[in-house]
Amino acid sequence: MRTNPLLGFLAALAALWLVAPATAAESEAPRLVVLGDSLSAGYGIRPEEGWVALLSRRLEKEGYGYRVVNASVSGETSGGGLARLPRVLGTHHPAVLVVELGANDGLRGLPLDELRKNLAMIVGSAQAGHAAVLLVGMRIPSNYGPEYTSGFANSFVEVSMARHTALVPFLLERVAANDANFQSDGLHPIASVQGMLLDTVWPMLKPLLHPGAAPEAARPAARR
């Protein structure tokens, strides 16, 4: 989703680090990294209200030994995420990578083969580093016609099948039908429905996790 370029740049720098300094135990914990756009960055709401922050609390409550890193940036595209990926992977070495990108590409009419190529390269690079990957899909309005709209939604399915990843077909599945679930821009969910976003992601994410994971035990073999 769109935002001020300067704010996006500053957010990109901040996104490589957690808000609070890590304890020694957290530093040893395997990382679960969310690489996303404003839908995961928590645009228009407090950081602690977003679905990624709620995920961190759920993991702690249920005994999963992961440290969540939100490397999401408002306004991000698949190309921007791909460009940032080497630093994200090099800094955090994730055991699990959640990829939530593409909405801004769709709103701008990016050619779908380019979207699929970017997503596939992100997934492949993460898998080469032995990360389990969850691809989170989106849907867009039919501004560019039904063929593009359908092809956009199917792009996530195609990449997931080709790269053998877990898939959430549509992040906003539980909230999209009700305009009251969105901020005044009609694009970004309000704070009170962020738990519904997490509940959409959780069933596909949970099988990738290891309860009480130790740093080595939490790294599944690379998927081919």
Language model segments and positions:
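Serine-esterase "nucleophile elbow" of acetyl-processing enzymes
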Residues: 23-74, 84-93
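Alpha-helical cap/lid subdomain in secreted, periplasmic
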Residues: 54, 64, 82-224
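Bacterial N-terminal signal peptides
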Residues: 8-18
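Residues at secondary-structure transition points
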Residues: 14, 23, 42, 48-50, ...
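Positively charged n-region of N-terminal signal peptides that target proteins for export
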Residues: 1-5
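Acidic-and-aromatic substrate-binding clefts and catalytic sites of carbohydrate-active enzymes
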Residues: 75-79
